[in-house]
Design a protein with these regions (language model features):
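Surface-exposed repetitive/solenoidal architectures
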Residues: 1-230
Length: 230
């Protein structure tokens, strides 16, 4: 079974500061993905977090650079000017993201969790300049989710989310139903900075899917987009 449930215990804070934490789950759709000739059938899929009112303090800093790769079949080096021109982009076609949970292919449930800290994602071209890049969505709880997601009893405290394109305080990009309830904020609430699609709760929710929010009150301190210097 590739689908796992995490139950948080104890009385302290799960402080990820300085740990090099880069999110749980893979960065791309795990269901049928492949990267060149490398199959990705057995990637971790965390589908439930039972927070038990515990606090997770995030500290994620991801910088994606243009690179040279070697084609597996021809053996020749390929210059990749921009990350979104990646030769095997089909592996990232559905959802991809960075967050506490990076990408969720399957239905995702998170409840009774307190979240604080910072996530920062920036992409750079061959000249070392940051640019707007839609390859990775960024969200406080989940970067990209392909199935339905249900969040309840979430508290956001001084949470800062920076992304290269699609960014949301809770969810970067969703292609399915969203149900949010009993979500609140404390202190400064939520700061969100994105390259383009940016929202206090959700950066992008695809047309035609259910989007329900109830019994929630959140202080969204700032939502800002196209500020690549952040």
């Amino acid at each position: 079974n590739k689908n796992f449930t995490v139950k948080l215990t104890g009385n302290g804070t799960y402080d990820l500061t300085g740990t090099g934490f880069r999110g749980i789950n893979q960065l791309f759709d795990a269901k049928d993905s492949n990267l060149g000739d490398i199959k990705c059938d057995y990637t971790l899929s965390l589908t439930t977090i039972q927070g038990n009112d515990q606090t997770i303090k995030l500290d994620t800093d991801i910088k994606a650079y243009a690179v040279k790769i070697t084609d597996n079949k021809s053996g020749s080096a390929i210059e990749i000017q921009d990350m979104d021109n990646y030769k095997y982009r089909t592996a990232f076609a559905s959802v991809k993201g960075v967050g506490l949970i990076n990408c969720s292919t399957y239905a995702l449930t998170v409840n009774n969790l307190k979240l604080s800290g910072k996530i920062s994602v920036k992409t750079y071209n061959n000249d070392g300049q940051s640019y707007v890049n839609e390859d990775l969505s960024t969200g406080g709880i989940v970067g990209g989710v392909q199935s339905s997601c249900t969040f309840s009893g979430i508290t956001l405290t001084d949470l800062e989310i920076y992304g290269a394109y699609t960014v949301g305080g809770l969810i970067g990009k969703s292609t399915n139903n969203i149900n949010i309830s009993n979500v609140k904020s404390e202190n400064s609430g939520v700061y969100v900075y994105g390259g383009f699609e940016t929202g206090g709760l959700v950066g992008n929710s695809q047309k035609g899917n259910e989007f329900a929010v109830k019994d929630s009150k959140i202080r969204i301190n700032k939502v800002e987009f196209a500020n690549l210097d952040k």
